[in-house]
Swiss-Prot record:
One of its GO terms (molecular function) is DNA binding. Residues 658-848 form the Reverse transcriptase domain. This is Gag-Pol polyprotein. The record marks 229-230 as: Cis/trans isomerization of proline peptide bond.
Length: 1470
């Protein structure tokens, strides 16, 4: 058999020859395969005898397994053969090669892992350096075989920790997918879900992964349907989609599917594939940059470009072939021109190593210097050969710029290309990897001395900041240069102060600014001769044309290299050169140079420095536009005095030098008036620009910060620092496309010349977009800084920053300085004089300490005469103080302002107001202080009744006051204290949500029985939180009781009043069941007053208990609300009478229906006053309401009933009487705006959409609250109604991809609000409530919830009138749509008509006049307008022609007053 065949005995050989090469194949293994395997062992350094034993086969597998995935076909065949031999040695029955491979993978689970498990700790670390440990840290992860069972091995904490750290550091970058693949190798779905569950802070990304899992699971269920019928006993079921995801399967089932099922289903690998699809989608969302957009910058190193390119490639969701094609084509195609030339020279398909080696240093200074040197050397050698200058001089050997050796050039250097850091100059790393100090604003001395760090003295616009030391270096800026030079500031780190005597001339010298948009040429005096020369920091020597300068004295011949080759020059030593105001001495070269050059030998002596600033160009620019159809301001500059013109010229000159303004010419068609006022110190002027016209035309902005932060909402900190951003607006650049609209003109005195025109380059003061853009930009900058400085708590309002921390003093100061440095890097200066480091800190009108806060001092002044303006300021002070001083009142002081309009009107004080003023003055004498918020402690709000309709409340934590406030708002003329108390609670709740984000526990001065008695009938409050009822006097009580049932045994008073609308005369009276009656004549009254007078008369003449029947809905509505105070004297008298009664029954009956005593009293008081009209169809209206529960407006319009009758029909309904009808307000909404929300009715989910402007609703029951169902419902709305804007909350179904895709497809703008925020989703929340109320009324009439929802929609849309126009919601919606169409059609017709001109004749005058503007065209005549006069001309005397006059463009206008006046006039007429 031979040596190789001895690997198997005869029995084993028989088994070996029965094993097939492939499943279901014909060929089987033969002896020749063993002989071939023995010959191949030498290739891998293995002995053929290893095939004879089980251990030997395992060693062979250990060597071949790493090579098998990427090996050749022969190597894979050898690996398969060894696996078959191993199974034969282990006496395991296998049918084919695939079964043998599966057994080897399952049982052995890679031999190298067994070695890892038995290797000692010292060797383990050594061996693991080259391989990746298993996720579980076990050799048999994820399972171990114990007998015939498989036991799960959980993931190790080390693996989970590595996964969490990877996600936190990479933030779902492209590296996450391979990291997950490596860590989840061999995991079960249970293990993978454990890896996902530890990512608690990335719910958005996990939701995306979850959606992918659901889609893939559903697809799996479709392609793998379960078998019909029950499974045989003991048979393992097939996994479904949810089983693979691990939601409906156990770990043991997952192991059985992977290892013992027939056929086996690797659910772990399938689930990994689904997760990888989701992660790839997350990577794409978190890395939106496409590989097509990755291009190499002009000076970007090729290595950095390659890093960015492959990072984008890894984030692309594409196949391997597509990525390979992208790499081969785009990597070279998107390189910069320098690298592209080199890469194309490498031939087809170069390797990445070859490309990186070839493009080292391309674009850097060393590369450019090498190219320049080689070019100059070639040119110089040619020139010297032509001139004969090279005779007798041996040519030096070439020197390599890469290795520094002689004998070869850099391009021939065999050594790798060396790289140097552009920051520190050291080799071995690039600038981006440099660990040295990153100075964003550096000054490089020309003479090569050590660089010093300078602070920026200018922000984006050039605003100066105070230096950190007292040592200042003088600046003399050039008139033509921008602010690019800064004062030097000595740094505390790695530097020491030198005495003045040791300072070099450079350090204490001055230097000037030079613009770089043209050549920096200066006139200097050399040897007494004035010469214009170029200041060149790149030139070593100073060289002057021989035609411009002749020097006396000795000289030496010299050849210097230039761009054009070598030059023969004369070298003069010790030549005096005067540059600016400095006298310098040095070497000057005279020769045939193309241009005079002052080199570094003189510039260094002059103290010249290159100042390179990291200005605010990194700040993102916010795009701004005008409103649709609006144009920029074109206002004439009004006259200014001479001193103001001079002041404006000086201010603008400074701003222009600092880069905040730019000059513009007459081609800019826009202008805004400018003026100036004196500052408070009267020594300086302040420039003001009247941007009112521009503000009208500018797009609307949303104030990103709705209010100022309150100290009570801040957490207590050990250390506090207050920082102010200097010249905040001037630090932020303005959109370049919008700058033209900010143009203004500085006139000249007596119009001696054209005015100087400027435009703003930064955010201007007074423009409405400046606050929003600054807040938004500064917020984004602070977000980046907060990620770095997590120890600091930063609170921002505009340019004021509150910075707190729990660190010690020195550490806190260091963090604050780091914060200031980061802001400075972004161009936001924080002047030292505005930094507050010691308490008390003055911030936003408060005084702050680390443990408490106070208000800044408030003093109430005493004046002889008070004007309206003075009182307004006084009320403002008291309202500001009311947030910390309890008990302050302003009601009587505010009454003094009623009816006053002029700010300078003198106000007379009332005794009540003076008493209130003195009381407030005493309260303010006692200083109050507040504490800071502690999140772990409960928040409580205590309310006190002050009397006179005013209330006070305090927010507390464990007895310490956080904040106080007052409430005195009264919406209605007649009200009671319980209604006001509900308003107080609402205000407190909203204030707590804004400041702390949570509702407090309320302590209210009311008894529970009193509140519940009133609340049972009170329906106008839509939101009342939970509270504690505290018996603290003075209590809120109900002063009288209205019974709901008639009082037996008491007389019934039928009351009524009547009034004549013309004469204003009327009668009021009553008649009782016992025949008692009384009528009173009234003068100058109304129907309502007469009705109330009648009730007052009945109360006066009745006993302690009384039954009163009225037909006045007005009086009924007032008295059933149980008011305790009123601005009406008559109602106050009625309240006083009702308080004295023990019990009162008040009932309403419809008028003029012949009802007993009501008809009699009606006739009695109406005699001679009004006409009585009895009404029918009430029964029909009641039947209609019983069926549809229509509101009173629909009943009044449909059946012709008075409002009071229709309202009473609704009030008498037992289902509609509980809470009445909601009070409708006005909603400012566009016709295309809808709101959508989900609510729950009877345990089912109902999705509701409301058209905000009309109140029309669409609703239906959906099976699940998912994005898919929501998108389906939205598609129905889009298909039925015109919708342009959808507003929802930020629930997961509304923020899902399905809804986003549907909004994109339907061109619907989607915005979200915050749940439970009083300012969000007001319309839809109200409609949800109304829909539930309607369903509650009709629920007994229908069987299913779905039917009830649709019936309720019909009733709401078609059976209830009211609101805008008194229409139903459906009528209102259709009316709005048709109105919009009509308006658009009419505007089109008007625009077409206005395009025509009319020539006409008048009377007998044969001369044609015109052209006039056509206003209207009829059948027999036309209406036209000429000048200001409208004329009607017969059709036969008019000729209508189209206006073909060419339109003037913006540049055609003359920008002079009066130019284009006719056009402006016509525009105004239209």
């Amino acid at each position: 058999m031979g040596a190789a065949t001895s690997a198997l005995n005869r029995r084993q050989l028989d088994e070996f020859e029965h094993i097939r090469l492939r499943p279901n194949g014909k060929k089987k293994y033969q002896i020749k395969h063993l002989i071939w395997a023995g010959k191949k062992m030498d290739r891998f350094g293995l002995h053929e005898k290893l095939l004879e034993t089980e251990e030997g086969c395992k060693k062979i597998i250990e060597v071949l397994s790493p090579l098998e995935p990427t090996g050749s076909e022969g190597m894979k065949s050898l690996y398969n053969l060894v696996c078959v031999l191993l199974c034969v040695h282990q006496e395991k029955k296998v049918k084919d090669t695939e079964e043998a491979l599966a057994i080897v993978r399952q049982c052995c689970h890679l031999v190298d892992k067994e070695k890892t498990a038995v290797t000692p700790p010292g060797g383990q670390q050594k061996n693991n350096t080259g391989g990746t440990a298993t996720p579980g840290g076990s050799q048999n992860f994820p399972a171990q075989q114990q007998g015939n069972a498989w036991v799960h091995v959980p993931l190790s904490p080390r693996t989970l920790n590595a996964w969490v750290k990877a996600v936190e550091e990479k933030k779902f970058g492209a590296e996450i997918v391979p990291m997950f693949q490596a860590l989840s190798e061999g995991c079960t779905p249970y293990d993978i879900n454990q890896m996902l569950n530890v990512l608690g802070d990335h719910q958005g990304a996990l939701q995306i992964v979850k959606e992918i899992i659901n889609e893939e699971a559903a697809q799996w269920d479709v392609t793998h349907p379960p078998p019909a019928g029950p499974l045989p006993a003991g048979q393992l079921r097939d996994p479904g989609g949810s089983d693979i995801a691990g939601t409906t399967s156990t770990v043991q089932e997952q192991l059985e599917w992977i290892y013992t099922a027939n056929p086996r289903v690797d659910v772990g690998a399938i689930y990994r594939r689904w997760i990888i699809l989701g992660l790839q989608k997350c990577v794409k969302m978190y890395n939106p940059v496409s590989v097509l957009d990755i291009r190499q910058g002009p000076k970007e190193p090729f290595k950095d470009y390659v890093d960015r390119f492959y990072k984008a490639i890894r984030a692309e969701q594409a196949s391997g072939e597509v990525k390979q094609w992208m790499t081969e084509s785009l990597l070279i195609q998107n390189a910069n021109p320098d690298c592209k030339v080199i890469l194309k020279g490498l031939g087809m398909h170069p390797t990445l190593e070859e490309m990186l080696t070839a493009c080292q240093g391309v674009g850097g200074p060393s590369y450019k210097a090498k190219v320049m040197a080689e070019m100059m050397q070639n040119l110089q050698s040619q020139n010297m050969v032509q001139q004969g200058g090279g005779r007798g001089r041996p040519r030096p050997p070439p020197k390599c710029y890469n290795c520094g050796k002689f004998g070869h050039m850099q391009r021939q250097c065999p050594e790798p290309r060396k790289i140097k850091c552009l920051k520190c100059g050291k080799p071995g790393h690039l600038a981006k990897d440099c660990r040295g100090q990153v100075n964003f604003f550096r000054v490089w001395p020309v003479d090569g001395d050590k660089t010093k760090k300078f602070s920026r003295s200018h922000s984006w616009g050039g605003t100066k900041c105070a230096p950190s030391t007292e040592q200042l270096y003088t600046l003399r800026p050039s008139k033509e240069a921008p602010a690019a030079v800064c004062r030097e500031r000595e740094t505390n780190e790695k530097s020491e102060q030198k005495p003045p005597s040791e300072q070099s001339r450079l350090e204490r010298g001055i230097f000037f600014e030079l613009p770089l948009w043209r050549r920096p040429i200066r006139t200097c005096i050399i040897g007494g001769t004035a010469v214009k020369a170029l200041l060149d920091t790149g030139a070593d020597d100073t060289i002057i044309k021989d035609t411009d300068l002749q020097l006396r004295g000795s000289w030496r011949p010299k050849i210097v290299g230039g761009i054009g080759g070598g030059l023969n020059v004369k070298e003069y030593d010790n030549v005096e050169v005067q540059l600016e105001d400095k006298i310098l001495r040095g070497t000057v070269l005279i020769g045939a140079t193309p241009i005079n050059i002052i080199g570094r030998n003189f510039l260094a002596q002059a103290g010249a420095k290159l100042v390179m600033g990291q200005l605010s160009q990194t700040i993102p620019i916010t795009p701004v536009r005008l409103k649709e159809g609006a144009r920029g301001p074109r206002l004439k500059q009004w006259p200014l005095s001479k001193e103001k013109i001079i002041a404006l010229q000086e201010i603008c000159k400074t701003l222009e030098e600092e880069g905040k303004l730019s000059r513009v010419g007459g081609d800019n068609a826009y202008n805004t008036p400018v003026f100036c006022i004196r500052k408070k110190d009267k020594s300086q002027w302040r420039m003001l620009v009247d941007f009112r016209e521009l503000n009208k035309a500018t797009q609307d902005f949303f104030e990103v910060q709705l209010g100022i932060p309150h100290p009570a909402g801040l957490k207590k900190m050990k250390q506090i620092t207050i920082i102010d951003v200097g010249d905040a607006y001037y630090s932020i650049p303005l959109d370049p496309e919008f700058r033209k609209y900010t143009a203004f003109t500085i006139p000249t005195v007596n119009n001696e010349g054209p005015g100087i025109r400027y435009q703003f380059n930064c955010l201007p003061q007074g423009w409405k977009g400046s606050p929003t853009i600054f807040q938004n930009t500064a917020s984004k900058i602070l977000e980046e800084i907060k990620k770095e400085l997590k120890q600091l708590t930063i609170v921002q309002y505009m340019d004021d920053l509150w910075v707190g921390s729990q660190e010690e003093g020195p550490k806190h100061d260091q963090l604050v300085q780091t914060l200031r440095n980061r802001l400075q890097e972004w161009g936001l200066e924080t002047p030292e004089k505005k930094v507050q480091r010691e308490p008390p800190f003055e911030w936003m009108g408060y005084k702050l300490w680390p443990h408490k806060w106070k208000l800044q001092s408030i003093e109430l002044e005493k004046k002889e005469q008070w004007t309206v303006n003075d009182l307004q300021k006084l009320v403002g002070k008291l309202n500001w103080a009311a947030q910390l001083y309890p008990g302050l009142r302003t009601k009587n002081i505010c009454k003094l302002l009623r009816g006053k309009k002029n700010l300078l009107d003198v106000v007379e004080w009332t005794p009540e107001a003076e008493a209130e003023y003195e009381e407030n003055k005493e309260i303010l004498k006692t200083e109050q202080e507040g504490t800071y918020y502690a999140p772990e402690k409960p928040l409580r709000a205590a309310v006190q009744k002050l009397g006179d309709g005013q209330w006070s409340y305090q927010f507390k934590q464990e007895g310490k006051i956080l904040k106080v406030g007052k409430f005195a708002k009264q919406k209605a003329t007649h009200t009671n204290e319980l209604r006001v108390l509900a308003g107080v609670v609402q205000k407190i709740g909203k204030e707590a949500l804004v400041i702390w984000g949570q509702l407090p526990t309320f302590e209210l001065p009311v008894e529970r029985d009193t509140w519940e008695q009133w609340w049972a009938d009170y329906w106008q409050v839509s939101w009342i939180p939970e509270w504690d009822f505290v018996s603290v006097p003075p209590l809120v009580t109900l002063w009288y009781t209205l019974t709901k049932e008639p009082i037996p045994g008491e007389d019934v008073y039928y009351v009524d009043g009547a009034c004549n609308r013309q004469s204003k005369e009327g009668k009021a009276g009553y008649i009782t069941q016992q025949g008692k009656q009384r009528v009173q004549q009234l003068e100058n009254t109304t129907n309502q007053q007469a009705e109330l007078t009648a009730i007052k008369m009945a109360l006066e003449d009745s006993g302690p208990k009384v039954n009163i029947v009225t037909d006045s809905q007005y009086a009924m509505g007032i008295l059933t609300a149980q008011p305790t105070q009123s601005d009406s004297p008559l109602v106050e008298q009625i309240i006083a009478q009702m308080v004295q009664k023990e019990a009162i029954y008040l009932q309403w009956v419809p008028a003029h229906k012949g009802i007993g005593g009501n008809e009699e009293i009606d006739k009695l008081v109406s005699k001679g006053v009004r006409r009585i009209l009895f009404i029918g169809r009430i029964e029909e209206a009641q039947e209609e309401h019983d069926r549809y529960h229509s509101n009173w407006r629909n009943l009044a319009d449909t059946f012709g009933l008075p409002q009071i009758v229709a309202k009473e029909i609704v009030a008498m309904c037992p289902k509609c009487q509980v809470k009445g009808e909601p009070i409708h307000g006005q909603v400012d909404a566009s016709p295309g705006v809808w709101q959508m929300d989900c609510t729950h009715i009877e345990g089912k989910i109902v999705i509701v959409a409301v058209h905000v402007a009309s109140g029309f609703i669409e609703a239906e029951v959906i099976p699940r609250e998912t994005g898919k169902e929501t998108a389906k419902f939205l598609l129905k709305i889009i298909g039925r109604w015109p919708i342009t804007h959808l507003h929802t909350d930020n629930g997961p179904n509304f923020t899902s991809q399905e809804v986003a895709a549907m909004c994109w497809w339907g061109k619907v703008e989607h915005t979200t609000g915050v749940p439970y925020n009083p300012q969000s989703q007001g319309s839809i929340e109200s409609m949800n409530k109304q829909l539930k109320e309607i369903i509650g009324k009709i629920r007994d009439d229908c069987q299913y919830t779905e039917t009830a929802v649709l019936m309720a929609c019909h009733i709401h849309n078609f059976k209830r009138k009211g609101g805008i126009g008194g229409l139903t919601a459906a009528e209102r919606l259709i009316n709005m749509i048709t109105t919009q169409l009509e308006i658009n059609t009419l505007q089109t017709k008007i625009q077409k008509i206005l395009n025509f001109r009319v020539y006409y004749r008048e009377g007998r005058d044969p001369v044609w006049k015109g052209p006039a503007r056509l206003i209207w065209k009829g059948e027999g005549a036309v209406v036209l307008k000429e000048g200001e006069e409208l004329k009607v001309v017969p059709r036969r005397k008019a000729k209508i022609i189209k206006d073909y006059e060419p339109r003037k463009t913006l540049g055609d206008e003359t920008h002079l007053e009066g130019a284009g006046g006719s056009d402006h006039q016509m525009a105004g007429d239209s």
